[in-house]
Amino acid sequence: ERLVEAGAVLGSKMGWERANVFAPAGAPPVLDYSWEAPTWLPWSRAEQAATRQTVGIFDQTSFSKYLVTGPDAVATLQWLCTADVDVPIGRAIYTGMLNSGGGYEADVTVTRLAPTEFLVVSGAASAVRDVDWIRRKAPDGHRTEVVDVTAMYAVFGVMGPASRELLARLSGADLSDAAFPFATSRELRLGYATARATRITYVGELGWELYVPVEFASGVYDDLFTAGALVGAVPAGYYTIEAMRLEKGYRAFGRELVPDVTPIEAGLGFTC
């Protein structure tokens, strides 16, 4: 409802309705299919400019989200992931899961929430695949549970050079580099909600991903734009994410990362 009111041109991924791009006031929110440059191109260009210069706010609720827990959760993820995930609580790690040929089966972010609890996040199309992969490939005897919590949390990406100012204004927290370094994850109070904020980006700008219990999603979304009005925040969609991640050289599972491409071939040796 909030997205439609803002002029969203909606698309879908794995049953999730989500904003591809936002039409400006007065323009019909529909895609114009043409052999020429489409009418939505300047709409996305404006979203990209705002994300680079002020703040873009993205609804990324369609992210696949699952908890990996249990006495052997660390050992299971250490076995499956290319990166070392035995990190301090509140640390997020970008990593992959590979097949026996060294090719990608999953492209994920793993955040340690507790000694034996991890939040694993991947693309919208990968939830069933990733959960199945972890369950099937976990070593025999490991006491590890995998629970899909995708529908329990909305995700808002607050991205851009003014994202720190916006979230500091809303939360009252210290979000400086010293207090909240890159790849740090911790809880923030946002209005009536307690959300998990992870400092990470898929668009190449300063930003945070906010994981919000769904019952508080509408209120937090409204609060973000109320605070964001003071810094020029705009709603932005998946066309903008795709354009900016390509410009930055970030990879995506199912596109650059597939089962016959290795981390070295993908230029992601640093994740191993």
Model-derived features with residue positions:
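Glycine/proline-enriched, intrinsically flexible loops and inter-domain linkers
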Residues: E1-C272
